[in-house]
Swiss-Prot record:
Catalytic reaction annotation: a 2'-deoxyribonucleoside 5'-diphosphate + ATP = a 2'-deoxyribonucleoside 5'-triphosphate + ADP; a ribonucleoside 5'-diphosphate + ATP = a ribonucleoside 5'-triphosphate + ADP
Cofactor dependence: Mg(2+)
Keyword tags: ATP-binding, Cytoplasm, Kinase, Magnesium, Metal-binding, Nucleotide metabolism, Nucleotide-binding, Phosphoprotein, Transferase
Source organism of this protein record: Cellvibrio japonicus (strain Ueda107)
Name of the gene this protein is made from: ndk
Protein's cellular compartments: Cytoplasm
GO molecular function terms listed in the Swiss-Prot or TrEMBL record: ATP binding; metal ion binding; nucleoside diphosphate kinase activity
UniProt cross-references to SMART domains, sorted A to Z: NDK
Name of this protein: Nucleoside diphosphate kinase
GO biological process terms on file: CTP biosynthetic process; GTP biosynthetic process; UTP biosynthetic process
Annotated NCBIfam families: PRK00668.1 (NF001908)
Documented EC number(s): 2.7.4.6
Amino acid sequence: MAVEQTFSIIKPDAVKNNHIGAIVARFEKAGLKVIAQRMLQLTPAQAEGFYAEHKGRSFYDELVAFMTSGPVVVQVLYGENAIALNRELMGATDPTKAAPGTIRADFSMSMPANAVHGSDSPISAAREIAYFFPTHEVVVR
């Protein structure tokens, strides 16, 4: 298995409902390390840039509005098979279809307020990490 980095966002709904610690604990319990983390309020321009690949899709405007509705926590996670492991921990994108015990099943109820975002590939992880974190802010421990 490869040791790799992945990108995660704890979304406004989970931040508002004080689930940050519980979500980070899930990552750490599964063996992922948080090697960079920051809380911020996304601007519309930041959200539009981050989700540019979805521009023109039916959910894009709602997603941008939601992601700018409150603070988010952006993170870089590190560990064995980090991308796949994080996606497994998150569960299905639609919380109503997420398996019991996954982050989305336990901490969210609807779309797009589904608690977390995670990279879906090594290419996405590299792009998403670079969007929010300069290289010197990502410290492997």
